[in-house]
Amino acid sequence: MKNNESASAAADAQRIEEVTRMAEAIFQSNDMALNWMRRENIALGNAKPIELCDTDEGAAKVRRVLSAIEHGNSV
C-alpha cells in the first residue's frame, strides 16, 4: 500500500510541476503562475487548478484552459 501511495504522490507532484511550468511560460512570471494555480477558476467550475492536478483528467482540463489563455481563445 505504501508503494502505491508514494507512486501516486509522485505522479501528483509531476502533474503539478508540469502544469505550473506551462502556466509560468504563459504568464511569464512564477508568482503569477502560482497565484493562478491557487485561485478558484470559473472556467474550471470554480475549482482551483492546483487541486485538479491530482488526476490526469483534471490536469488535462487545466492545460486546456491555459492553452486557451495562451492563444487568446474563450474557454
Q: Which residues does each PLM region occupy?
A:
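Non-transmembrane "mature" sequence context
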Residues: 1-75
